[in-house]
């Protein structure tokens, strides 16, 4: 198990904002670049990254309980005082803002398509948010709901540099160590 979170995702009632493989690849690519610049061989297996790192970063995307699009309040980033969305605490204890963006249609405000905006509250003192839009919402497995994040503009962990630094700080396992345990 890469993160030791299988039980949470399979058994508990949760909402999972699923990052795409592409966003994970981008973050790991930066980690590989930094790791290589430090004189180390490239990471060839995701299991070389400690489970504690995967757990910390995957926890950013998991909320306790089930929240479908209809359960989430409106957010308007241009009128945040009126439509702020809602702050939730992730499985890992971080504050995240979640809101539904109501699009405009034919010049009429808020009657168009709706899209969930999942935002990491980077600095709560200045309301600094790192946003991730949902591409597909309300996938409902047996124990919760999954919202898949857009791949084009999201980095795993909301900041791939911080992910890379955390992985380096925790230590990268040698590939030979991983192969012995498999």
Q: Model features per residue range: what roles?
A:
Residues 1-182:
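Mature, structured domains of secreted/extracytosolic soluble proteins
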């Amino acid at each position: 198990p890469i993160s030791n979170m299988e039980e949470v995702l399979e058994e508990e009632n949760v909402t999972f904002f699923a990052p795409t493989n592409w966003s994970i690849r981008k973050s790991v690519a930066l980690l590989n670049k930094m790791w290589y610049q430090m004189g180390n061989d490239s990471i060839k297996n995701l299991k070389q990254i400690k489970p504690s790192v995967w757990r910390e970063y995957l926890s950013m995307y998991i909320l306790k309980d089930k929240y479908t699009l209809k359960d989430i309040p409106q957010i308007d980033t241009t009128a945040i005082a009126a439509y702020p969305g809602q702050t939730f605490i992730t499985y890992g204890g971080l504050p995240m803002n979640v809101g539904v963006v109501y699009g405009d249609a034919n010049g009429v405000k808020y009657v168009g398509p709706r899209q969930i905006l999942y935002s990491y509250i980077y600095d709560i003192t200045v309301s600094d948010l790192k946003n991730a839009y949902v591409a597909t919402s309300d996938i409902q497995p047996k124990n919760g709901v999954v919202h898949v994040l857009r791949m084009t503009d999201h980095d795993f962990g909301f900041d791939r540099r911080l992910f890379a630094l955390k992985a380096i700080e925790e230590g990268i396992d040698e590939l030979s160590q991983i192969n012995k345990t498999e």
